[in-house]
A protein has these predicted regions:
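Acidic, Ala/Val/Gly-enriched low-complexity intrinsically disordered segments
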Residues: 6-10
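Non-heme di-metal
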Residues: 11-306
Length: 306
């Protein structure tokens, strides 16, 4: 299906002699908005707002695991297991999904005007730069600032190092069925732009929900959480930290707002809520495993194990 879009003939030639490079996120969002008619953008934005509200009210948003982790009474064995499971479910494949979305933005054309895919790719790139370890600014040679060691996935591996989880244990870890299902559900979306954008936005919401409790439970064991992975995840309300999860989530919803057609709505709503359902089962399973191993400490009990 197609819908009215902004004319591509009315814009003057872009000049590079005096480039305007300020506020890149806002410029990308404005360009995405301009690629649709005002009426279509508004309809899409209303749908996205309704879907976000449904997700905010979904049981995953108040899962008991949040309170249990925040209690700081989770034993080390359980936390090691949870981090390995979470690694398989989302950490290892998250940037794969971002790159899949960048590629599949090609599906916007020719339904939208030539070049319309680039604003979305630009916005996704800002997310990817953070994930890959780049930072705003220029180095001493006037080049980009960045270090692959600061990419979020390697930073997560450093958390496993802090827990004392060996490389052999990581390789030999057998993810639970639900961890495999959560991962596969995202990976199966890679072929369709609207699908992967929807699930990435939901995944960011899960990161925002569960990173602070995971950080708190990790810190309660005496592990460092004021640097590394938990310095960029789990501290969205800390101005001194480098978290950008809220911006990333908003960006992905803007991506979806541009990409939507009227015919997509019900299928994407179902897709997003099914992914939330899987995350409920994922956290149910983590708690069940931990309870079965008597790994959730009683209030007041020693939280660090030998």
């Amino acid at each position: 299906p197609s819908f009215p879009r902004a004319s591509v003939d009315a814009s003057p030639m872009i000049s590079l002699k005096n480039p305007d490079l300020q506020a890149p996120r806002q410029k990308a969002i404005a360009a995405m908005r301009a690629s649709l008619s005002p009426e279509q953008w508004e309809r899409n934005a209303q749908f996205v707002a309704q879907l976000r509200q449904e997700i905010a009210q979904h049981p995953v948003s108040r899962h008991p695991a949040i309170a249990r982790l925040n209690s700081g009474t989770v034993r080390r064995e359980a936390m090691e297991q949870i981090h390995l499971e979470y690694r398989h479910a989302i950490v290892q494949s998250f940037t794969d999904a971002l790159l899949a979305a960048q590629m599949q933005s090609r599906q916007l054309e020719p339904r939208l005007a030539p070049g319309s895919k680039m604003a979305g790719r630009f916005l996704l790139t800002l997310n990817v730069l953070d994930e890959f370890g780049f930072r705003p600014g220029q180095d001493a040679q006037g080049y980009y600032l960045g270090n692959p060691a600061y990419a979020h996935y390697p930073l997560y591996e450093d958390v496993l190092n802090a827990y004392g989880i060996s490389n052999e244990a990581r390789v030999n870890h057998r993810p639970s069925a639900i961890a495999r299902e959560v991962r596969a559900f995202l990976e199966d979306s890679y072929g369709r732009y609207t699908d992967v954008a929807t699930l990435l936005a939901v995944a960011e919401e899960e990161v925002i929900l569960f990173s602070p409790p995971l950080r708190k439970a990790t810190g309660a064991l005496g592990l460092e959480v004021n640097d590394g992975y938990y310095y960029v995840h789990g501290v969205s309300d800390d101005d001194s930290a480098e978290a950008a999860d809220d911006d990333h989530e908003d960006d992905l919803w803007f991506i979806l707002t541009q990409a939507l057609t009227d015919a997509d709505r019900e299928s994407l709503r179902t897709l997003g809520l099914r992914y939330c359902d899987l995350w409920v089962r994922f956290w149910d399973h983590q708690m069940t495993l931990a309870d079965g191993a008597t790994a959730w400490a009683k209030p007041g009990a020693e939280t660090a194990s030998a």
